[in-house]
From Swiss-Prot:
This is Non-functional pseudokinase ZRK6. One of its GO terms (molecular function) is ATP binding. Pfam families: PK_Tyr_Ser-Thr. The protein kinase domain is predicted to be catalytically inactive. The gene is ZRK6. It comes from the Eukaryota. GO terms for biological process: cell surface receptor signaling pathway; response to temperature stimulus. The keyword Oxidoreductase does not apply. ATP binds at I40, K41, N42, F43, S44, Y45, D46, Q47, I48, K83. Interacts with RPP13L4/ZAR1. Coiled coil: none annotated. It comes from Arabidopsis thaliana (Mouse-ear cress). Gene3D superfamilies: Phosphorylase Kinase, domain 1, Transferase(Phosphotransferase) domain 1. Keywords: ATP-binding, Nucleotide-binding.
């Protein structure tokens, strides 16, 4: 009879979890969107266990995530991505992820939330399945430059939506290749809103210490990880580091670092003590200045600018791209540098402007004969 007693205790605990977790999710929904969001389906404990084969290792999705363990599964006869929160994730963060994911699920450039299971602690999230789990394998496979530009434009489109579609501004705050997914059609989708920060209506910034906590946790998660083929992003906005203010420029700065990751700037200068992936090393030096006191006051854009001046565009951009796409990729690289603070032309005012310029670059890439006239406007 002990097994029956244990079963009843576990069922009672799961019922309590639903009540407690549901209260936190509701609170986040009210705070983020005044309770107005897409319906959130509640999957049962048994459905999740069956879909993941009791979270079997063979069902694990191959990806690195600071906050989640990701599993492949089948629910309602469709493939899904099931994200189980780690215990480093507090309840408020995961419930914020649920709330904001539900708000943006109708947009094509966000990972679509199908539902969640509140019987677990922390809750389990169920998303549409992304066949290409992260950008890491993509970057190491050297995709064409048109595809890279398209991915950047789609991610910029998602950030623009976060910044402008609601009465309050939402700052993603932890953009990196590990928070971006690709579906079966190669469409980029932004996910993971655990650290999403809300700027109150009528304000342009907010003070927040979430970013510092996230980067410390991320550093510990990635420590000793090699061969990822991507830089150790996100890149912290220097204005945030000096003032603690989170603004739309916080996302713009991280997005610029992501753009540089897409062109895979590579090592050309041993004297700078860079790793095999130059941009990863640059980001490491910027994110973790305590590792090397020589770089404490040396922002990322100074590193990149110095390397470009010394070696030139063709020496630092992925060799598969440098010969076939000179005009659009140079414009792409220039825009990335402007996003991270380089003074190259007019300053960027918002992600709306970044998205518009990426559309021009993408158009010029598809119609090479118009490259020079298109690039002159950027």
């Amino acid at each position: 009879m002990d097994w029956l007693r244990t079963k009843r205790i576990r069922a009672k605990k799961r019922k309590r979890n639903v009540k407690e977790n549901g209260e936190v999710v509701l609170k986040e929904l009210i705070e983020c969107c005044d309770g107005k969001c897409n319906p959130i389906k509640n999957f049962s404990y048994d459905q999740i266990i069956k879909a993941t084969n009791n979270f079997c290792q063979s069902n694990r999705a191959s990806r690195i995530d600071v906050y989640y363990r990701c599993y492949k599964g089948m629910l309602d006869d469709r493939p899904v991505l099931i994200k189980k929160g780690k215990y480093t994730l507090d309840m408020k963060e995961i419930c914020r992820d649920i709330a904001i994911s539900s708000m943006v699920s109708g947009h094509k450039n966000f990972l679509k939330l199908l539902g969640c299971c509140l019987e677990f602690t922390p809750p389990v999230l169920v998303f549409e399945y992304a066949e290409v789990i992260t950008l890491g394998p993509l970057l190491t496979s050297h995709p064409g430059y048109l595809r890279r530009i398209k991915i950047a434009r789609e991610v910029a489109n998602a950030l623009t939506y976060l910044h402008t579609a609601f009465s309050r501004v939402f700052i993603h705050s932890n953009l990196d290749p590990f928070t971006i997914f690709l579906d079966g059609n190669g469409v980029a989708k932004l996910g993971n809103f655990c650290n999403c920060i809300t700027i109150p209506e009528g304000e342009t910034f907010v003070h927040d210490d979430t970013l510092q906590k996230y980067h410390e946790l991320r550093h510990n998660t990635l420590k000793g990880t090699h061969g990822l083929g991507v830089c150790n992003l996100p890149v912290i906005d220097p204005d945030y580091k000096s003032t603690g203010k989170v603004t739309t420029k916080t996302d713009m700065h991280s997005f610029g670092g992501f753009m540089l990751a897409l062109v895979q700037i590579r090592e050309v200068d041993d004297e700078l003590s860079l790793s095999s992936d130059m941009l990863r090393a640059l980001a490491d030096l910027f994110i973790k200045p305590y590792d090397d006191v020589r770089y404490v006051h040396f922002p990322l854009h100074h590193h990149v600018s110095k390397i470009l001046r010394k070696f030139g565009y063709a020496e630092v951009v992925d060799s598969d791209m440098s010969e076939v796409a000179a005009w659009p990729i140079k414009a792409f690289l220039r825009l990335a540098l402007r996003c991270i603070g380089c003074k190259l032309g007019d300053p960027l005012s918002s992600m709306i402007q970044v998205t518009k310029e990426l559309r021009l670059i993408e158009k010029s890439a598809y119609y090479p004969s118009n490259n020079r006239s298109q690039m002159s406007s950027i």
